């Protein structure tokens, strides 16, 4: 069931290497049997993430589109989202009745956010290997995203990061906004993220 004004658009952001492409891959595979889905990835000078999704068979190749943003990936999702809006329109024309479009940002810093014109729902991915101080550093991705995903929890002992500290700081920085600990390598947390997307997109029980 697509939105009256087009598909429900989920923006997935976060620093380089945090697990954005892995999350996009897992969500596509978990939801593609129930929903009409496309994915758009943003890279600075390549289409590497789109190629990864194609190789992993997250979706059929024609449902995956790579966008080259140039040197400022945050601009393409915030200040001038026209290149991504055009990509969404192209996918919507290619697949009438599209339910969901995942839009993965290029790796950027904690200040990057999606324009509300581009994304109906935002998921921000950080990872434990960057240290347990990341949630308390704040930034729009940490504090304003609809869902914060704290990935790679299996690495916590190796980098001496405290999940308890990250839990406490995430609650403090986000207030009532939800967050989840995940290990995308093993699909831990994926079902909860799927349920969140379906609930927020009015897709549950359809």
UniProtKB/Swiss-Prot annotation:
It comes from the Bacteria. The keyword Nucleotide-binding applies. Transmembrane segments: none annotated. One of its GO terms (molecular function) is GTPase activity. GTP binds at residues 14-21. InterPro entries: CobW/HypB/UreG_nucleotide-bd, P-loop_NTPase, UreG. It is found in: Cytoplasm. Keywords: Chaperone, Cytoplasm, GTP-binding, Nickel insertion, Nucleotide-binding. CDD domains: UreG. Homodimer. UreD, UreF and UreG form a complex that acts as a GTP-hydrolysis-dependent molecular chaperone, activating the urease apoprotein by helping to assemble the nickel containing metallocenter of UreC. The UreE protein probably delivers the nickel. Facilitates the functional incorporation of the urease nickel metallocenter. This process requires GTP hydrolysis, probably effectuated by UreG. Belongs to the SIMIBI class G3E GTPase family. UreG subfamily. This is Urease accessory protein UreG. The gene is ureG.
